Amino acid sequence: MIKITLKDGSVREYNEGITIKEVAESISAGLARVALAGEVNGEVKDLSYPLENDCTLNLLTFDDEGGRDAYRHTTSHILAQAVKRLYPDAKLAIGPAIENGFYYDFDVEKPFSVEDLEKIEEEMKKIIKEDYKLERFTLPREEAIKFMEERNEPYKVELIRDLPEGETISFYKQGDFVDLCAGPHIESTGKVKAFKLMSVAGAYWRGNEKNKMLQRIYGTSFTKKSDLDAYITRIEEAKKRDHRKLGRELDLFDIYEEGPGFPFFMPKGMVLRNVLEEYWREEHRKAGYQEIKTPIILNEELWHRSGHWDHYKENMYFTKIDEADFAIKPMNCPGGMLVYKRKLHSYRDLPQRLAELGLVHRHELSGVLHGLMRVRCFTQDDAHIFMTPDQIESEILGVISLIDDFYKVFGFKYHVELSTRPENSMGSDEDWERATNALKNALEKKGIDYKINEGDGAFYGPKIDFHLEDSIGRTWQCGTIQLDFQMPERFDLTYIGPDGEKHRPVMIHRVVFGSIERFIAILTEHYAGAFPVWLSPVQVKILPILEKQHDYVAEVKKALEEKGVRVEADLRNEKIGYKIREAQLEKVPYMLVIGDKEMENRTVAVRSRKDGDLGPMRLEDFVNRIVEAIKNKEN
């Protein structure tokens, strides 16, 4: 008999060799119906997987990431089978589950059209109806290569050849279709209830632009049609909110062919950006940070010393000055190290919090560039906190509070992930354990739930990532807290302790916005361009009905400007309805309509973007109202 510990902590005994599906059936018929896979000792397996030893078992449904991934991975195999039926000469590449769906890459003679996707969807429906069982089998390396060569699948052969010696080479079969795959998968094709092919795009084999361009079909799938419909509605809403479209329409920012990945900010976009940066500076001053500015170009030797050369060289730009090699900074950290190192520090000076809005450049492939979300140059709101070991927890708690305050102002909810040591890391096991435990303790002291991302930390230390949830339910990773014992070592940073001896400080890297450009893109989509009044580039638009009201308009404008309100007057000889419609399209928070009555009574007729017609209001009352809304950063 073996002992199986379930998610609720209960322990059950079963015969050796019982499958995950049979365990689910022994618990309840309802659970067996919705179970898609099982997590055995932390590893996701098919329901047919036999349990031979004592283990922990978590039965996964579509509500669990592992269950969703298995379900969508199977849908990608159904897609591949449909494509092979319709286009027998198509060569298969890869087809994983991804966040919100799946994709499969194909090598085909001509790109897929929208009509092709419709045909493929119909074929997929047939395969689902045929309800093929997914069966896993393995082959020795040479047999696996021969098997895929006989099927004329060169990409699969390449993948097999690249697998380490001794690696288990597994395949999944459904009907007459077979694919190289590590799994896991759900039981049968008939279990897929609702799916949609979303789009097609070009993708280089293995992400390398020197390789052949393949056709990537994206799709998604759900266990309920209602959930699929809701997702498609969200996607349509996201298209309307696309920051690239709104950035142009609202005259905020754009990207031109002459500078792919290098954003241009227009006057209104600069207003928005400056408001964000001023808020950032104000809050950091209150939290005891000092602002610094470090150069964009620094000697190549510095990047060897920092470790970026070994871990980040492929993403860097280089230049020569006076025959010496220089690099354009991809990160602000090394500059911050030099600022700290410039003089001797006492333990009484610590913690020292150095903050920087630093412009960085990173080489990104043209295929992944996306508006302000993925660019080649951006401003990162970095800070580096240097401290004694006994200050670690209090400083992490302070950063968490600061980040929490920032996100609340914008109305964001968030979840937190703790990322641990990656393979290509620097430093000792002891340092990594100490750093990881410090982050865990701070989160637990704050009462914040968190998920662990094994192996996803930075190369110099573990990190906490903050994932914002926007108004249509999408998540965006923005804030980061990274604890680093390595960089102070590499730069030989010290402070004088109470014993009069030199000691090594500990350092936190952290960002709140992350990339300012990306944060602006997120805000633009979150608010659909209708920014709260404190962020709006134009907060008030004055709309006179006739030219004779222009003198009073100037008076109203001056009264608002004297209080720091950003205001424009539309003095064009156009009908008032047209002016109102245009101001609405510009998403201005307040419109003040001025006619003869308003001029005589020293009032303004107020229209709110949010609440519509608010009626007449004394000018002084409106000024007080909007000043209060701006001061309180009302959303």
From Swiss-Prot:
Q: Which InterPro entries match?
A: aa-tRNA-synt_IIb, aa-tRNA-synth_II, aa-tRNA-synth_II/BPL/LPL, Anticodon-bd, Anticodon-bd_dom_sf, Beta-grasp_dom_sf, TGS, TGS-like
One GO term describing the cellular component:
cytoplasm
Q: What PROSITE patterns does the database record attribute to this sequence?
A: AA_TRNA_LIGASE_II, TGS
Output the Pfam families linked to this UniProt entry.
Answer: HGTP_anticodon, TGS, tRNA-synt_2b, tRNA_SAD
What's the EC number here? 6.1.1.3
The reaction(s) this protein catalyses? tRNA(Thr) + L-threonine + ATP = L-threonyl-tRNA(Thr) + AMP + diphosphate + H(+)
User: Which residues make up the binding site for Zn(2+)?
Assistant: 333, 384, 509
Q: Which cofactor does it need?
A: Zn(2+)
Which part of the chain is the TGS domain? 1-61
Region described as Catalytic = 242-532
Residue ranges that the Swiss-Prot or TrEMBL entry lists as coiled coil? none
Q: Name one GO molecular function term.
A: metal ion binding
Q: Where are the transmembrane segments?
A: none
What does the cofactor section's free text say about binding? Binds 1 zinc ion per subunit.
Q: What is its main location?
A: cytoplasm
Its annotated compartments are: Cytoplasm
GO biological process per UniProt: threonyl-tRNA aminoacylation
Give UniProt keywords alphabetically: Aminoacyl-tRNA synthetase, ATP-binding, Cytoplasm, Ligase, Metal-binding, Nucleotide-binding, Protein biosynthesis, RNA-binding, tRNA-binding, Zinc
User: What disulfide bonds does the UniProt entry report for this chain?
Assistant: none
Record has Secreted as a keyword: no
Which proteins does it associate with, and in what oligomeric form?
Homodimer.
User: What family does this chain come from, according to its entry?
Assistant: Belongs to the class-II aminoacyl-tRNA synthetase family.
Relate the protein's function as given in its record. Answer: Catalyzes the attachment of threonine to tRNA(Thr) in a two-step reaction: L-threonine is first activated by ATP to form Thr-AMP and then transferred to the acceptor end of tRNA(Thr). Also edits incorrectly charged L-seryl-tRNA(Thr).
Q: Which NCBIfam families match?
A: thrS (TIGR00418)
Q: What name has this protein been given in UniProt?
A: Threonine--tRNA ligase
| Organism of this sequence | Acetivibrio thermocellus (strain ATCC 27405 / DSM 1237 / JCM 9322 / NBRC 103400 / NCIMB 10682 / NRRL B-4536 / VPI 7372)
